[in-house]
Amino acid sequence: MGVSGSGKTVIGKALAPRINAEFIDGDNLHSQRNVDKMAAGIPLTDADRLDWLLLIAKVGREHVAHGTSCIIACSALKKSYRNLLRTDNTTIRFVYLKGSFDLIYDRITKRSHQYMPSTLLKSQFDTLEEPLGDEQDVVTISIDQSIPEIVEEIAKADLIS
């Protein structure tokens, strides 16, 4: 979890084979309406995100039901979003990829993304509710290190039960 540009996709893809999990990019689960809205530089509302979050939760529960592990890259910016994702899934774990606005802005302006312009980064930081101590299923990882170091730190956290 984390704002756009925090490395969710890159880290998720690198971590998945390490922990024998399927990688699913939550960006690919957005409705066309949401994609069009973001491409136009319009931030998503809670209502816009609801169906997307419900689909992500469903995909996660399906993996649990089949006894398989998955990594779903998803912003999960608010605690209420994370709570929705936790519904009927006691095995869910979150990895919060934490970085400063300046670091992530620098990254996001150097990449090409199909629909997420750098102008929306501020709205993501404005929406972000960083996980607190009451969210025991969240591990916070600083992204101010290399991809292999981040993957190693997550793998050592032993999130798969």
Predicted regions and their residues:
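Glycine-rich phosphate-binding loop used to anchor ATP phosphates in small-molecule kinases
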Residues: A47-D88, L97
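P-loop (Walker A) phosphate-binding loop of NTP-binding proteins
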Residues: V3
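Conserved beta-strand scaffold positions in the cores of enzyme catalytic domains, especially
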Residues: F23, N28, F94, V138-T140
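C-terminal alpha-helix
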Residues: E153-S161
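Conserved substrate/cofactor phosphate-moiety recognition/catalytic segment
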Residues: S6, K13-K58
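Conserved nucleotide-binding/hydrolysis micro-motifs of P-loop NTPases
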Residues: L29-H30, A76-K78, G99-L103, S146
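Conserved phosphate-donor/acceptor-positioning beta-strand/loop module used by diverse small-molecule
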Residues: D88-R107
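Small-molecule kinase domains that catalyze NTP-dependent phosphoryl transfer to phosphate-bearing small molecules
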Residues: K110-E153
